[in-house]
UniProtKB/Swiss-Prot annotation:
Organism: Bordetella bronchiseptica (strain ATCC BAA-588 / NCTC 13252 / RB50) (Alcaligenes bronchisepticus)
Binding site for ATP: G37, P38, S39, G40, C41, G42, K43, S44
Protein's UniProt name: sn-glycerol-3-phosphate import ATP-binding protein UgpC
Task of the protein: Part of the ABC transporter complex UgpBAEC involved in sn-glycerol-3-phosphate (G3P) import. Responsible for energy coupling to the transport system.
UniProt KW Amino-acid biosynthesis keyword: no
This protein's record includes keyword Glycosyltransferase: no
PROSITE patterns: ABC_TRANSPORTER_1, ABC_TRANSPORTER_2, UGPC
Coiled coil: none
Keywords: ATP-binding, Cell inner membrane, Cell membrane, Membrane, Nucleotide-binding, Sugar transport, Translocase, Transport
GO biological process annotation, one example: carbohydrate transport
Residue ranges annotated for the ABC transporter domain, each copy included: 4-235
UniProt-listed InterPro entries: AAA+_ATPase, ABC_transporter-like_ATP-bd, ABC_transporter-like_CS, ABC_transpr_MalK-like, ABC_transpr_MalK/UgpC-like, Mo/tungstate-bd_C_term_dom, NA-bd_OB-fold, OB_MalK-like
Major location (coarse): membrane
Amino acid sequence: MATLSFRNVKKTYAGNVPVIHGIDMDVADGEFIVIVGPSGCGKSTLMRMVAGLETVTEGEILIDDKVVNTLEPAERDIAMVFQNYALYPHMSVFDNMAYGLKIRRLPKDEIRKRVEAAAQILELGKLLDRRPRALSGGQRQRVAMGRAIVREPKVFLFDEPLSNLDAKLRVAMRLEILKLHRRLNTTSLYVTHDQVEAMTLAHRMVVMYQGVPEQIGTPMEVFEKPASTFVAGFIGSPPMNLLEVAVGGDGIVHTSDGIALDISPLAVPQQVRGRKVVMGLRPEHMLLNAQGLAAEIEMIETLGSEQLVHGRCGKHMVVVRCSTRQFSETPARVGDTLTIGPDGRHPLHWFEADTGRRVEGL
């Protein structure tokens, strides 16, 4: 196990194209960090720099307080699990898992001991003689993880390992990875674009946007107190409703197109009064037929136990996530107009209109 540190790490490609704008972060021994963000945000580039597959333009990456910028990948004592498994098709499961150890010229008895131990952890014991083509997608990914485990590295790197799996298998493999980490407690860095993976796996998550870490925190910190409108709109399904509003000195709120919101001034903090800001409301923290604003229903999504009600209020689209029972008590059809508003039990979110950052002190 090991610590992992980033000291003002930057990456610029040829032509002075910046990809990573400067990251400072410390990963504790045994911590599971998930880097999440949309395509092109720099998350995989950051992981590749840790692995030694990309050079660091500026700053330092340290493993156990040792700068590794100039070390070859093989010298960093890390193991990486890829999205596409990267298995040798002509080798058995055993040989795929043992290959890296053979290259390092470990004794045969030690190799067998490590492979069989990893196979037991991952429930691959009966599959060691099979070739990859005879395995399911989930089994192949477990072999890829087994190949990383047998190396007994200081740091695990996971590069979108579940992206090629179907939805049901992704859920199962998330649980496998959670159990694996609890058992091995190895420092881990995990890259994904999937917020569900980030929320369920991470001790802390790094939300990346355009090469910048927008927010670093525990999953619940990020969910309950997003640092920016980007984070608010990226974490949460459906994402947070964001409305451009003008707040009067008396706490009365109007949308940017002049529609009054029937919200108690007591729910409006002093920091936003007399200003133009962005107000955020989580869909699951809103109610139908509640004080707030009138919205015309444009679409209703039925998800079994839940309903997603999409309504338009002027230029803003607003989504309410409610139980099917609550929805049945408020029968509504597309084209109807309903009042929707906050449930009063959860605070509203407020962001700066110009920067998108969370209003300080809130």
